[in-house]
Curated annotation (Swiss-Prot):
Organism classification: Viruses, Duplodnaviria, Heunggongvirae, Peploviricota, Herviviricetes
A GO cellular component annotation in the UniProt record: host cell cytoplasm
Inducing or repressing factors: Expressed during the early stages of lytic infection.
InterPro entries with a match to the protein in the record: UL49 (IPR004339)
Cell location: Host nucleus; Host cytoplasm
Primary localization: host cell
One GO biological process term: viral process
Assembly and oligomerization: Interacts with ORF34.
Keyword flag Zinc: no
Keyword RNA-binding: no
Family named by the database record: Belongs to the herpesviridae UL49 family.
Phenotype of the disrupted gene, per the record: Deletion mutant shows mainly attenuated late gene expression and decreased virus production while viral DNA replication remains unaffected.
UniProt-recorded name of the protein: Protein ORF66
Length: 429
């Protein structure tokens, strides 16, 4: 069933409107009609749903001082439309908005609130579109506004709530308990040396078993849910995050912080390749070039960048990970053999070659990555700012060394103008 037909049935069943009147004055048909798919995106994301290419009908709904004027332009291209046609068009536009709200939130309005008199629909014609949507949702006791999702186009480092730490209460998640080790099997009666346990030791052990039948194990379900959600969301093209740090339960806040860190924090900068000799040398070194191991959550490089370097100031780093051990490297678990980041504890890592190719076919280009000492590549704003970074050695095909450079950002962008800048002392001699 087409979406506009589903909306008509929704209006008839919910508000008791005349289906014949709705069919006679359709607003989602014709050359000047509103496309149903675009209208759904408009209701959810507003102007941001069109990514800068907003159609004329959406512009009329937002800019006209009243819904009646917007409908008049949509229906006839002028300011004169019959009153009944205006009311039917308003019922379709506002009713479709309510349908989207009810479908996404699974909310239900009271039966007595659905019987909307004709004069109330006529009143909505004198209001702007956004205010008419808010008034109708308020009448139906639906907690909603237009648009449903507020899109913020500001860069994440400029958001005010990213410049302060979270000092609120820690979320209290229900903890699980499992049977103690002695209740999972037969307890040993001898120690490792083959010596028996005395009567006093046996009594002490039995007393401890009685008072501690279970042991806490945290909440593995929350940990599993958070891990699965994070891995799923980083593969999505669009993700909706909480508007501020204080909203949502602890798991939601943690996911929002991890997603922002995944998309914002990075130590790598792609240097534009200017010289053809540098491009050929980088292509030849793809298999043997130096590599950077980057934690995908805190954004730190774990094999470069330790010591005293010129770093980029990045205040939001304290929001994502407040602790700083001054040591970005690997931590290997002696029990399981898993490798963790010593800074944030994550095991989600990725290896980036410092010489690589991006794109395919005619869009392929050579990329040389420069690795900063911290995770603030996004915060570089000033061309005169001095930074420390690591680049690969391109001297000989067998050399896997990396070079430490101290340059300003302008010099970093012009570094590939000559091959000599990418030769270590051994290769240049």
């Amino acid at each position: 069933m087409a979406l506009d037909q589903r909306w008509d049935r929704f209006l008839v069943s919910w508000f008791g409107l005349d289906e014949a009147q709705l069919t006679a004055h359709r607003v989602f048909e014709g050359e000047n009609g509103v496309p149903v798919e675009e209208y759904v995106a408009f209701v959810i994301f507003g102007e941001r749903g069109f990514q800068g290419n907003m159609p004329s009908w959406a512009r009329h709904l937002l800019d006209r001082p009243s819904l009646a004027q917007a409908i008049a332009v949509l229906r006839a291209g002028s300011d004169t439309v019959a009153k009944q046609a205006q009311i039917c068009a308003a019922q379709q536009l506002l009713g479709a908005h309510v349908w989207v709200v009810v479908t996404l939130s699974r909310a239900q309005a009271a039966d007595h609130a659905r019987a909307i008199p004709r004069h109330v629909w006529a009143k909505y014609l004198s209001l702007p579109f956004s205010k008419a949507c808010a008034q109708l949702c308020k009448l139906l006791a639906l907690c909603s506004r237009f648009p449903l999702v507020t899109c913020c186009s500001k860069p994440p480092p400029s958001l005010p709530w990213l410049r302060k730490k979270w000092h609120g209460p820690l979320p209290r998640r229900p903890l699980l308990e499992v049977p103690s080790p002695t209740r999972r099997g037969v307890a040993a009666t001898e120690d490792g040396n083959g010596l028996g346990i005395g009567a006093a030791d046996t009594g002490l052990r039995e007393a401890l078993e009685r008072v501690a039948p279970t042991v806490p194990c945290g909440n593995p379900f929350d940990a599993m849910l958070g891990s699965l959600c994070f891995l799923s969301l980083i593969k999505s093209r669009h993700v909706v995050l909480p508007a501020c740090e204080q909203e949502g339960p602890g798991l939601v806040r943690n996911l929002g912080r991890r997603l922002l860190a995944y998309n914002v924090l990075s130590p790598c900068v792609s240097i534009p390749v200017i010289c053809s000799r540098v491009a050929r040398a980088a292509l030849a070194k793809r298999a043997r070039c130096a590599r950077a191991v980057v934690c995908m959550e805190c954004g730190h490089c774990l094999n470069f960048g330790r010591g005293k370097f010129h770093t980029v100031n990045f205040p939001p780093t304290n929001v994502f990970f407040s602790r700083d051990r001054k040591e970005k490297q690997f931590t290997i678990c002696a029990t399981t053999g898993r490798i963790y980041c010593s800074y944030c504890g994550s095991e989600h890592m990725r290896v980036y070659p410092l010489c690589d190719i991006t794109g395919r076919g005619t869009l392929a280009r050579v990329v040389i990555r420069a690795v900063l000492a911290n995770n603030a590549a996004l915060a570089i704003r000033d061309l005169d700012q001095t930074v420390s970074f690591v680049v690969p050695c391109l001297g000989t095909p067998d050399c896997e060394a990396a070079l430490l450079k101290h340059r300003d950002v302008r010099g970093l962008l012009q570094l590939t103008s000559q091959l000599l800048e990418f030769c270590c002392g051994k290769c240049s001699s």
